[in-house]
């Protein structure tokens, strides 16, 4: 019989940042005896999870995709946001052959160029500056029919902040003398990632048929009407923007459709509705043969043009484990399963040799403030069983609660979420110690520690740019190093496991064995 393994466990408490101020801080307000005791009695440090330290622009808040890529890569990975900013600044973007090719083909055939994406300055799934650059590219290349389909944010930005962005684009189109915003809809519909196809269908119909529940002459009028219906940006219902005398912006065969989101997880479903011949999420009322361009690759099995294909990462933590014949488990709920698998593996969809995966279904509720504990009890049960199984050299687990409940902006629910996590951490730490394993507890970015925006007084539903905790639980006598970042975690784990760190990993171990 094989020797029982003593696992190195990484628990990622999604959205669990560190903030000294107590006001509007769900983590401080929650009763967390377990985390308090670990912080007081175990080796610990604070690490950076935002901005330049994770390959984002300076002071840009972190997010789950970026966080997990850096965690798994063991090096700073320059994100699509930063890469695109640079390309636009030096004008390489305006010569991108995939983007220019799609625009030119549509223009030469007298067809429309449709641009869609999350119109947001949040920088998590997209950035409105990139969308503006795409509008300029289409106009510069002589396209006459340019239609922008704006997905509204209110999640990575304040809940009612879309008006200034929409005005900026209205002014741009007026200055160009061509093109217009053709539709607005909340990301709740257009950017679902949990197979809630009834939501996606509403966005698809709006785009393909130019039909929605509402119509307005201007974007601001459409937005104000939504606010009057008590819909924040995220939840704005399908609204056609079309003044009298303006042509219909329904999509037709041969049109170009450029999707300007750079983050994959919430871009996949609506992309599949356009691209997959065998799509069965809902019965499409109109199937259009558009020239579809993904800004980045949303999934390897989506067969359509990609403007910025992924740069491959060699010797990520998962790949290095496989090369060294180690066994590993990835486990999370639906909401963060892609993060501990695809993103942690550097954008690789397939599992590595010796890598098992467990997916726990997230609860089917409209918003997670209705069930702040989410599926954490079942997740913990499965995680504890895996720790005690003796099968795994390493286990990577993500608890989504701090982030998903933090996004609702409901303080009371976020406190409950954090308290549920404290019980989970207790069970996990006990299990790890009972088998002589090691445990690192950290987060990928902040969220729940800031539940109200002090400037506006509105609920703070976005991530933060604050540091996150890192705690060591285990039998090794270790000393914490200050000044770490997410990309130091993989080298830290390898070091604690007594393994060589591959040269591609430029991060440094944050716990030194004394």
Swiss-Prot record:
Statement: the UniProt record of this protein carries the keyword Manganese: yes
Active site: 64 (phosphoserine intermediate)
HAMAP family, alphabetized: GpmI (MF_01038)
Binding site for Mn(2+) 2: 14, 64, 444-445
Cysteine pairs bridged by disulfides in the record: none
EC number: 5.4.2.12
Family, per entry: Belongs to the BPG-independent phosphoglycerate mutase family.
Name under which the protein is recorded: 2,3-bisphosphoglycerate-independent phosphoglycerate mutase
Catalytic activity: (2R)-2-phosphoglycerate = (2R)-3-phosphoglycerate
Broad enzyme group: isomerase
Signal peptide as annotated in the record: none
GO cellular component, one term: cytosol
Cofactor(s) required for function per UniProt: Mn(2+)
NCBIfam families: pgm_bpd_ind (TIGR01307), PRK05434.1-5 (NF003897)
Binding residues annotated for substrate, in chain numbering: 125, 155-156, 187, 193, 263-266, 336
Cofactor: record remark: Binds 2 manganese ions per subunit.
Pathway: Carbohydrate degradation; glycolysis; pyruvate from D-glyceraldehyde 3-phosphate: step 3/5
Oligomeric form and interacting partners: Monomer.
Function in brief: Catalyzes the interconversion of 2-phosphoglycerate and 3-phosphoglycerate.
Binding site for Mn(2+) 1: 403, 407, 463
Example GO BP: glucose catabolic process
Gene Ontology MF, one: phosphoglycerate mutase activity
Keywords recorded for this protein, A-Z: Glycolysis, Isomerase, Manganese, Metal-binding
Source organism (scientific name): Escherichia coli O6:H1 (strain CFT073 / ATCC 700928 / UPEC)
Transmembrane segments: none
UniProt entry tagged with the keyword Isomerase: yes
Entry-linked InterPro entries: Alkaline_phosphatase_core_sf (IPR017850), BPG-indep_PGM_N (IPR011258), Metalloenzyme (IPR006124), PGAM_B_sf (IPR036646), Pgm_bpd_ind (IPR005995)
């Amino acid at each position: 019989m094989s020797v029982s393994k003593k696992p190195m466990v990484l628990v990622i408490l999604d959205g669990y940042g560190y903030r000294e101020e107590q006001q509007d801080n769900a983590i401080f307000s929650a009763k967390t005896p377990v985390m308090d005791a670990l912080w007081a009695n175990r080796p610990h440090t604070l690490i950076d999870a935002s901005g330049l330290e994770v390959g984002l622009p300076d002071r840009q808040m972190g997010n789950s995709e970026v966080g997990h890529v850096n965690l798994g890569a063991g090096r700073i990975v320059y994100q699509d946001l930063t890469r695109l900013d640079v390309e636009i600044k030096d004008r390489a973007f305006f010569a991108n052959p995939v983007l220019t090719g799609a625009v030119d083909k549509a223009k030469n055939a007298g067809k429309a160029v449709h641009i869609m994406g999350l119109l947001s300055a949040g920088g998590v799934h997209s950035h409105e500056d990139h969308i503006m650059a795409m509008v300029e590219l289409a106009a510069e290349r002589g396209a006459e029919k340019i239609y922008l389909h704006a997905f509204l944010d209110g999640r990575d930005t304040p809940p009612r902040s879309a008006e200034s962005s929409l005005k900026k684009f209205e002014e741009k189109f007026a200055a160009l003398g061509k093109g217009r915003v053709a539709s607005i809809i909340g990301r709740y519909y257009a950017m679902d990632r949990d197979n809630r196809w009834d939501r996606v269908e509403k966005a698809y119909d709006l785009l393909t048929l130019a039909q929605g529940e509402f119509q307005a002459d201007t974007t601001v009028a459409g937005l104000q009407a939504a606010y009057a219906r008590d819909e924040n940006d995220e939840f704005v219902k399908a609204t056609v923007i079309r003044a009298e005398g303006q042509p219909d912006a329904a999509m037709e065969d041969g049109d170009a459709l450029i999707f300007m989101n750079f983050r994959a997880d919430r871009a996949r479903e609506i992309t599949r509705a356009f691209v997959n011949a065998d799509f069965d999420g809902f019965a499409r009322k109109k199937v259009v043969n558009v020239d579809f361009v993904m800004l980045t690759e949303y999934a390897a099995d989506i067969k359509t043009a990609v403007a910025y294909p992924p740069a491959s990462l060699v010797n990520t933590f998962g790949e290095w484990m496989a090369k060294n014949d180690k066994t590993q488990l990835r486990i999370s709920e639906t909401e963060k399963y892609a993060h501990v698998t695809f993103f942690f593996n550097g954008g690789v969809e397939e599992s590595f040799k010796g890598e098992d995966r467990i997916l726990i279904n997230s609860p089917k509720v409209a918003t997670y403030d209705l069930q702040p504990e989410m599926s954490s009890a079942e997740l913990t049960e499965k995680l504890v069983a895996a720790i005690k199984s003796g099968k795994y050299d390493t286990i990577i687990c993500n608890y989504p609660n701090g982030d998903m409940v933090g996004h609702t902006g409901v303080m009371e629910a976020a406190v409950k979420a954090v308290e549920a996590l404290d019980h989970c951490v207790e069970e996990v730490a006990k299990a790890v110690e009972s088998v002589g394993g090691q445990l690192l507890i950290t987060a990928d970015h902040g969220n729940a520690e800031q539940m109200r925006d002090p400037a506006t007084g509105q609920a703070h539903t976005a991530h933060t740019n604050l540091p996150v905790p890192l705690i060591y639980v285990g039998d090794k006598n270790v000393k914490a190093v200050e000044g770490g970042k997410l990309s130091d975690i993989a080298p830290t784990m390898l070091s604690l496991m007594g393994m060589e760190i591959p040269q591609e990993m430029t991060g440094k171990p944050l716990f030194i064995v004394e």
